[in-house]
Amino acid sequence: MKVIDQFKNKKVLVLGLAKSGESAARLLDKLGAIVTVNDGKPFEDNPAAQSLLEEGIKVITGGHPLELLDEEFALMVKNPGIPYNNPMIEKALAKGIPVLTEVELAYLISEAPIIGITGSNGKTTTTTMIGEVLTAAGQHGLLSGNIGYPASQVAQIASDKDTLVMELSSFQLMGVQEFHPEIAVITNLMPTHIDYHGSFSEYVAAKWNIQNKMTAADFLVLNFNQDLAKDLTSKTEATVVPFSTLEKVDGAYLEDGQLYFRGEVVMAANEIGVPGSHNVENALATIAVAKLRDVDNQTIKETLSAFGGVKHRLQFVDDIKGVKFYNDSKSTNILATQKALSGFDNSKVVLIAGGLDRGNEFDELVPDITGLKKMVILGQSAERVKRAADKAGVAYVEATDIADATRKAYELATQGDVVLLSPANASWDMYANFEVRGDLFIDTVAELKE
């Protein structure tokens, strides 16, 4: 870890705990800052706040009092999930207090080079693929960021012999200033999180922050399946390395079932260890990064062939009497579910879908669900999903929760079928996050097997 003194004796407010806030508070304290933590959860239900207080860090819980900002803070580090229209953040910005996310702290202290991965879908799988390929090549890829390991925590233990492979959300990237990866990947850009950002253009602008400090010596890996990505190439100083499944590009591409990098075959598409056209895109992005880091083709091929996927991302759960169960709880938008379905024969799929109602209609999903064996529909968005099923001519049943949906899907399936949880919706109408939803699916499958 680089020892920096820019925060020494500076008053810093950490707004919101969870993993990233707790990690940021500890790091800032270690760097000599005068830290105050403010979290909305009551103290008695807040183990993180209790632990920080025991370590001598000032903690204010149970709400976000605006008068707290009457103190002269030099900096605010916010939890990425807290939107910028939060009154505390608005007041801080009005007072001229810089507002960062914990990712910026990670960059400032990291001795390791950084590879940053963002995008609407495929971030976690691509991040994991890259980490595994680099580690197999002896470059020790350390996963961090939105993948569940706080970036500032991992950066503290990383040396210059490691590589920080960092998954980055749009929420995190809104709060960076000096952040400078040597390689950045944008997997794709689709209209998501509009409720947070206000518009698609603002969402894209947040993602685009990943390359703000990059130079011609750095590499920006972009998905040339999208015209938007092509249009953005003129707006960066970085050297663009494209990938595509639709055309031959000066980077990584699919041609005649083979994955190439700049004219050289790396492996066959059907050798990738996880199904789906979206995973071909993820593998191509990984190949581009790996080749930029001088990884040999055999290591790439062996690692991606053995890749078993990521929990909650088209994760194979079990096989019960010839019925295969896949957990794709991370599919919180329509595009992710479309890509999940592309890896299967619809006539053998019982799809579990529905969740938080964000006002979306699901007409885009109609061609993708046409021909499904059955659907099991649940959640706030059930009426909208049912309308799409009716348009597609797919029979469905309704369920009260994930456990009920899983049991009903199994009843509808026969030997050779697939039960696929790919909700096309966020989980927050019923569950704290997609992980909880996916874990309940896994638990119910285990019960069905008993």
Swiss-Prot record:
Q: Which GO terms describe its biological process?
A: cell division; cell wall organization; peptidoglycan biosynthetic process; regulation of cell shape
Q: Binding positions for ATP?
A: 119-125
**Pathway listed for it?**
Cell wall biogenesis; peptidoglycan biosynthesis
Which InterPro entries does this entry report, sorted A to Z?
Mur-like_cat_sf, Mur_ligase_C, Mur_ligase_C_dom_sf, Mur_ligase_cen, MurD
Name the catalysed reactions.
Answer: UDP-N-acetyl-alpha-D-muramoyl-L-alanine + D-glutamate + ATP = UDP-N-acetyl-alpha-D-muramoyl-L-alanyl-D-glutamate + ADP + phosphate + H(+)
**Signal peptide span:** none
A GO term from the CC aspect: cytoplasm
Q: What is its EC number?
A: 6.3.2.9
Query: Which keywords accompany this UniProt record?
Result: ATP-binding, Cell cycle, Cell division, Cell shape, Cell wall biogenesis/degradation, Cytoplasm, Ligase, Nucleotide-binding, Peptidoglycan synthesis
- The primary site where this protein sits is cytoplasm
Enzyme class comes to ligase
Q: Example GO molecular function term? A: ATP binding
Location in the cell:
Cytoplasm
Q: What does this protein do?
A: Cell wall formation. Catalyzes the addition of glutamate to the nucleotide precursor UDP-N-acetylmuramoyl-L-alanine (UMA).
Indicate the family of this protein. Belongs to the MurCDEF family.
- What is the protein name stated in its UniProt record? UDP-N-acetylmuramoylalanine--D-glutamate ligase
